[in-house]
Design a protein with these regions (language model features):
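Membrane-interface helix-start motif
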Residues: 40-54
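Nucleotide-state-sensitive switch-loop elements of NTP-binding domains
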Residues: 215-244
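Phosphate-binding/switch loop-helix module in NTP-utilizing enzymes
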Residues: 241-281, 288
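Non-transmembrane alpha-helical coiled-coil
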Residues: 1-43, 82
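Well-ordered beta-strand positions
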Residues: 270, 293-296, 324
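Short boundary/hinge segments that flank catalytic cores
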Residues: 52-176, 181-186, 194-198, 202-209, ...
Length: 359
């Protein structure tokens, strides 16, 4: 027992000595830590900064939207303005037919006022349905460009075509012919699209004997004139396509077609011809080699530049004279609006004094 007491006393003495050493060491060390300021909790979070984050998000989203729009425009291979048409094809833009955004306006212009019996068979003759509309002014501007396209005399034979189907060439052909007839000229419209004829539906006529009938065998002048119909409302002469033949290109390229055009030129002031798309069929290219000039209809945002370039090359290779391009369903920019500003204030001149004289 005494031995355990002595051992515990030894442990106690060692602990006392160690504590004394620690106290001496602590007193010898300088304490340079002090409280500078008592911490105060902030009124709002330090992070994230909401205003800064929203501002950065708006800037980044705007940059992304602009970049995406530029990228999509870079990928777009179509033409959408008269400037693009002229710069890429190196051809003059004769007119820009505006797109109708309002469905109410579209319905009014396409259907028109009709007659007393509510007949709307001429619904696609936009230049008649609303003579003061921007559409009618566009076609009057086109008429002026056509009449001034050749020095010395106005063209006798004119082909209106397009690169692809459904670009509006038939409606453009009909309205162009009507606008020429409004000057008092004797105008004939010929439906040479014997693959998908439409002129007879535009004028509400039956498509019985027509162009294909005359080209199937040699025809005399009196036979040709007998098949031509007259539309009193538009003061326009119409030759329908006739029955759809199995070989339209062969008929178009025949000697009968050349002879027929000579007969028509001798009897009419202007002959306006509607043909199939030239990038799809050879019919239009064959006709282009026989007429005084060609007008190419291009729907904005539809036909690729490569197809347009090919169409222009096809016409150039045969020596066709391209008067220019009509941009259909165009969104009007500054240059396109200039067309209508100019044509609007000259409309009375062409509808008044010019109508008294046959061109």
């Amino acid at each position: 027992l005494e031995q355990k007491i002595d051992t515990n006393k030894g442990f106690l003495e060692n602990l006392i000595k160690q504590q004394s050493s620690n106290d001496i060491a602590a007193r010898g060390t300088d304490n340079n830590i002090s409280v500078a300021e008592i911490a105060v909790p902030p009124d709002e979070p330090v992070s994230p900064r909401r205003v800064l984050s929203v501002g950065l998000a708006l800037i980044l989203s705007t940059m992304f939207g602009v970049g995406l729009a530029l990228f999509l425009e870079y990928l777009d291979d179509t033409v959408r303005s008269t400037d693009e048409v002229e710069n890429y094809l190196q051809l003059p833009a004769l007119a820009a037919i505006p797109i109708i955004d309002s469905m109410a306006k579209r319905r009014l212009l396409l259907v028109g006022p009709g007659n007393e019996d509510g007949d709307h068979t001429k619904s696609e003759l936009l230049i008649q349905s609303d003579p003061r509309s921007s559409l009618a002014e566009a076609y009057r501007q086109l008429r002026t460009s056509i009449l001034l396209s050749t020095a010395g005399r106005a063209p006798k034979t004119l082909l209106v075509t397009s690169s692809l189907p459904s670009e509006g060439k038939t409606i453009t052909t009909a309205n162009t012919a009507v606008s020429l007839a409004q000057t008092g000229a004797k105008v004939l419209i010929v439906d040479a699209d014997m693959r998908r004829p439409r002129i007879h539906t535009v004028f509400g006529m039956e498509n019985g004997s027509g162009l294909s009938s005359l080209l199937s065998s040699p025809a005399k002048e009196e036979d040709v004139l007998e098949l031509i119909k007259f539309d009193t409302s538009s003061n326009l002469y119409v030759m329908t396509s006739g029955p759809v033949p199995p070989n339209p290109a062969e008929l178009i390229g025949s000697e009968q077609m050349t002879s027929l055009l000579k007969i028509l030129q001798n009897n009419f002031t202007h002959v306006v011809i509607d043909s199939p798309p030239i990038a799809s069929f050879t019919d239009g290219v064959l006709i282009a080699s026989m007429v005084d000039g060609v007008i190419l209809v291009v729907q904005a945002g539809r036909c690729s530049r490569q197809v347009l370039k090919r169409s222009r090359q096809l016409l150039t290779d045969i020596g066709a004279r391209i008067f220019g391009v009509i941009l259909n369903q165009a969104k009007l920019g500054a240059k396109e609006n200039h067309y209508y500003y100019e044509s609007y204030y000259h409309a009375d001149h062409y509808n008044g004094s010019a109508e008294k004289n046959e061109i």
